[in-house]
Amino acid sequence: TNGTAVLGLGDIGPLAAKPVMEGKCMLFKHFSGINAFDIEIDTTDPEEFIAAVKRIAPTFGGINLEDIKAPECFEIERRLVEELDIPVMHDDQHGTAIIASAALINAMHLSGKRIDEAQIVVNGAGAAAIACARMFLALGARRDQITMCDSRGVVTTRRTDLNSVKREFATDRPV
């Protein structure tokens, strides 16, 4: 982590994010027997972060990214997946998307509907929300039936303040 997006706390920096990272390490050990080590990297520059992870990667069997702000987290994860020969996971994206997808699948089962019939509202447009929306698409949801909201309202094609990741889910439907 670089501590730029700690849940409920925001950008608190790498040292302040240490307790969260230590807690994740305990969960890895307790539930899977995997020894994990917290590593806090003191930079907000994606290139520096990527370079630091690449330098230490040979020591580890996998990398779990955590609490890195969007949209930088997407580029960091993409590059590390491409450039390293060990598994790389961004917990804020993938962990949340897995749980939300399980809930969506269950809701579809209980309602007797198919996922491609669902009208889905994603409240948020950060790393977790984007990953959830992408996972919903992979499960069969229709892009034109996903409405994403951020702190400024519905993410629409008419807005000029969207980064490239938010534009992926911008809607042109009247909402």
PLM regions with names:
Residues 1-87:
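N-terminal ligand-binding/catalytic initiation module
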Residues 7-32, 90, 98-175:
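Glycine-rich phosphate/diphosphate-binding loop of Rossmann-like nucleotide-binding domains
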Residues 40-42, 92, 150:
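Residues at the C-termini of beta-strands that transition into short coil/loop
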